[in-house]
């Protein structure tokens, strides 16, 4: 593995870690309606489990409601059951093929729990970034040992890997700070 490929590989892995964090944070309920809350909901449909988005269209008519428009009338009870089983703290209100999900306001205690969880996700991501950095530094040592790069070049590349790690770590901090503000906004 050459040094350019190594840097590109490290950057891709760090970008992937950031995407995982984004996905985890989207699942946190902020008191504001978002169809992403229902990403984890699966529905028993046509003999198999399917994501909710494959049997209904999802929309947010206002900041406190999610509408689930079920395409097949026979699926309404399955969709309700799937939403209830997902344990999201949402109570489905059915009106024909339309299921309304009012988003209850978050209590101060629940907001604090969500902020702690967001920080935990952030810390897990930083641990991933440090592991990626460690793997990169080990690969650099191997390149130096195999005489592919010189000692001073190894030092320079190590600094670049550290800078890359610092950059992504600060991105994680800003994403978490933004999510914290979103959660704490009443």
Swiss-Prot record:
The keyword Protein biosynthesis applies. Its main location: cytoplasm. It is found in: Cytoplasm. InterPro entries: Ribosome_recyc_fac (IPR002661), Ribosome_recyc_fac_dom (IPR023584), RRF_sf (IPR036191). One of its GO terms (cellular component) is cytosol. GO terms for molecular function: ribosomal large subunit binding. Transmembrane segments: none annotated. It holds the Pfam family RRF. One of its GO terms (biological process) is cytoplasmic translational termination. CDD domains: RRF (cd00520). Keywords: Cytoplasm, Protein biosynthesis. NCBIfam families: frr. Belongs to the RRF family. Responsible for the release of ribosomes from messenger RNA at the termination of protein biosynthesis. May increase the efficiency of translation by recycling ribosomes from one round of translation to another. This is Ribosome-recycling factor. The gene is frr.
């Amino acid at each position: 593995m050459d040094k350019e490929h190594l840097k590109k590989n490290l950057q891709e892995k760090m970008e992937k870690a950031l995407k995982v964090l984004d996905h985890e944070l989207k699942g946190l309920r902020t008191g504001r309606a978002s169809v992403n809350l229902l990403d984890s909901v699966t529905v028993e449909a046509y003999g198999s489990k399917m994501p909710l988005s494959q049997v209904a269209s999802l929309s947010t008519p206002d900041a406190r409601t999610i509408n689930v428009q079920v395409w097949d009338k026979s699926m309404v009870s399955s969709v309700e059951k799937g939403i209830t089983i997902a344990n999201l703290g949402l109570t489905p209100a059915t009106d024909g093929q339309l299921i309304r999900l009012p988003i209850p306001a978050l209590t101060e205690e629940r907001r604090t729990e969500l902020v702690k969880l967001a920080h935990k996700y952030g810390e897990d991501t930083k641990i991933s970034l440090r592991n990626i950095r460690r793997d990169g530094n080990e690969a650099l040592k191997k390149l130096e040992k195999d005489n592919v790069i010189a000692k001073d070049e190894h030092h320079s590349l190590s600094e670049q890997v550290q800078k890359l790690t610092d950059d992504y770590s600060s991105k994680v901090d800003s994403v978490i700070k933004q999510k914290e503000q979103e959660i704490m906004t009443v």
